[in-house]
């Protein structure tokens, strides 16, 4: 847990970078600090590992006032990832990854085993990449090594200062996905600095929107997008915040339609009869193990025969392979993108066991988005009532 209590940072020239900040990051939570250059977000983060000292106020790490902790010892307890990565050019990938365990005095065998484990965790085969040097890696690979190095001593807290800002958009999205996968397993307490609202929305459990050294809003992504607290936040988030909501609204089971379902070895005529009976022009096709195979059009070619009059056609003869599907809980944005990419009127959805649970259509997508907006509006009204009650007390 990280707690800021009335923290201010004022420089000798009178510039106040952070004004009376009170903020708490819960254990296992990922909080993104977002805002334009010079707004105080990086200063806030650097005060946690004492690269910058606050002018007043307190910062607590798991209940301990960090001003009483030796700065070097403190930094060895905190993972730190920066945009420039900062790998040592004369050290191999394995040795770079093992930097903090080395400083902590771990035995060589233990730290190298830990480095190999972390490289594998971030998607770099240690047998292929461990003996390489930083200049032999791509930008995305160097960034992965930076994340592995930050995790090597298993710190409870990670500080990440625009770690994916120096790579191209495709690599950036891939790194974001990989980091979300890691966080879902490791549950670190993370302060993540970015100037990109879309990155903040995509990664953060909560978002702190900074403006001129102050937090303008500190809320979950959906609330920041759906109910900006100030005109500044509304302007920073952008006029297309309705589209951005697609990134933070998950597909839920109640959003799905249930089309006719047939199996590969069903007679084609029986499958057509089922579609007619349910008033549908298509059906989802499952294989013998009830796993998703594809789909079948009511206009499937053929006269009900396969190789001749002796064998009636089956669904298998006319089924089309499924080009797109998503797991339950995926953002609506992925579903919308998939429909556009495949020129499809729906996308199949699977559960955690890869079982088919339904399809999401454009109309159901709209209903899901509307539901999310309505829920946020109810939350805002409830908060307003609570504030009025406190004010009247």
What function would you assign to each model-found segment?
Residues 152-156:
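A short, proline-enriched helix->beta-strand linker immediately N-terminal to the Walker B motif
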